[in-house]
């Protein structure tokens, strides 16, 4: 898997974006061809699919965590299906406590704390495992653009700062698909990290199914220390902003590609940078799980989702799913 940072031209069009447009046209054609040839299967339970239209972090994992807690509170049995990004997974696997991020992906390790999780790179491989687990609900993390299975309920996550970037498809822009079709079909749209009351113009037609959500810290961190922040996630800027809004003194930061698998040399370099800044290392939970027993001196910021319309979410989820 190619791992990329989010280039500036994905947010604001420039000559590079236009030069890449022919490849985006090919990407679009291949997507249409894939969808037209697909024969979607019915999974053995109701499916809630959480996805986005663009590359980069939009808060999907936090939405899945929120749904898992919601279903657990209602005593509804569920299984989470995750894509195992950045792992060496070769076949669908039910995650257990001993699995590492390299084996099943960072998101899988995190989500396993909330319930049963299947990691897979092929949606069709999960059916035998689902038949064993017999859930009432299947929460699918990502796979929104996957045409090979039926979705009963879809949630589209949108980052309030990036929105849909420059409006171009990969690689000229960040879009996996043009948003209108996905937004029209969505049962709910989450506008994530939205602290303003104003709704972006592109989302005003969908106000009746729009939920404003914030990603907020869920653990206590010593605010008297200096911190050097690093991350290898889809939206590192949001992580750094969350740290500052929390009141931490950030003396420096380093960005790695999304789903980055850290080497010992990276860790040594990070400790060196922290020492230069007289600071303690701080990172995300997705990064923290990759260090196993080596992360004792790295502080982790845990986050969770806070939403403005929990009643709307409850009504929609339990009415349809």
From Swiss-Prot:
Catalytic activities: a lipid A disaccharide + ATP = a lipid IVA + ADP + H(+)
Family annotation (InterPro entries): LpxK, P-loop_NTPase
One of the protein's GO biological processes: lipopolysaccharide core region biosynthetic process
GO terms for MF: ATP binding; tetraacyldisaccharide 4'-kinase activity
Pathway the protein contributes to: Glycolipid biosynthesis; lipid IV(A) biosynthesis; lipid IV(A) from (3R)-3-hydroxytetradecanoyl-[acyl-carrier-protein] and UDP-N-acetyl-alpha-D-glucosamine: step 6/6
Keyword field: ATP-binding, Kinase, Lipid A biosynthesis, Lipid biosynthesis, Lipid metabolism, Nucleotide-binding, Transferase
Positions with a binding annotation for ATP: 54-61
Enzyme class: transferase
A GO CC term attached to the entry: plasma membrane
Enzyme Commission number(s): 2.7.1.130
Family: Belongs to the LpxK family.
Function: Transfers the gamma-phosphate of ATP to the 4'-position of a tetraacyldisaccharide 1-phosphate intermediate (termed DS-1-P) to form tetraacyldisaccharide 1,4'-bis-phosphate (lipid IVA).
PANTHER family: TETRAACYLDISACCHARIDE 4'-KINASE (PTHR42724), TETRAACYLDISACCHARIDE 4'-KINASE, MITOCHONDRIAL-RELATED (PTHR42724:SF1)
Protein name, per record: Tetraacyldisaccharide 4'-kinase
Gene that produces this protein: lpxK
């Amino acid at each position: 898997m190619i791992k990329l940072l989010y280039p500036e031209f994905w947010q604001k069009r420039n000559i590079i974006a236009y030069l890449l447009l022919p490849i985006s046209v090919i990407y679009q054609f291949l997507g249409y061809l894939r969808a037209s040839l697909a024969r979607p299967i019915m999974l053995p339970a109701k499916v809630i699919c959480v996805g986005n239209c663009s590359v980069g972090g939009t808060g999907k994992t936090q939405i899945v965590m929120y749904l898992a807690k919601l279903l657990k509170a209602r005593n509804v049995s569920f299984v989470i299906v995750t894509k195992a990004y950045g792992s060496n997974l070769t076949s669908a696997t039910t995650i257990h406590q001993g699995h590492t991020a390299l084996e099943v992906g960072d998101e899988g390790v995190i989500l396993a704390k909330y319930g049963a999780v299947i990691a897979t790179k092929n949606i069709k491989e999960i059916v035998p495992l689902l038949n064993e687990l017999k859930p009432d609900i299947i929460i699918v993390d990502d796979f929104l653009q996957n045409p090979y299975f039926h979705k009963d309920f879809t949630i589209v996550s949108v980052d309030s700062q990036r929105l849909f970037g420059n409006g171009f498809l990969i690689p000229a822009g960040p879009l996996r698909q043009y948003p209108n079709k996905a937004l029209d079909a969505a049962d709910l749209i989450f506008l994530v990290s939205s602290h303003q009351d104003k709704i972006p113009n592109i989302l005003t037609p969908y106000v009746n199914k729009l939920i404003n959500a914030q990603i907020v810290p869920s653990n206590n961190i010593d605010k008297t220390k200096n911190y050097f922040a690093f991350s290898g996630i889809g939206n590192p800027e949001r992580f750094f902003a969350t740290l500052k809004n929390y009141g931490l003194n950030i003396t420096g930061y380093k960005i790695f590609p999304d789903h980055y698998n850290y080497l010992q040399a990276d860790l040594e370099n990070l400790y060196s940078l922290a020492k230069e800044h007289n600071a303690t290392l701080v990172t995300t939970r997705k990064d923290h799980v990759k260090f196993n027993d080596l992360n004792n001196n790295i502080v982790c910021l845990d986050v969770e989702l806070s939403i403005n319309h929990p009643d709307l979410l409850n009504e929609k989820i339990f009415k349809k799913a």
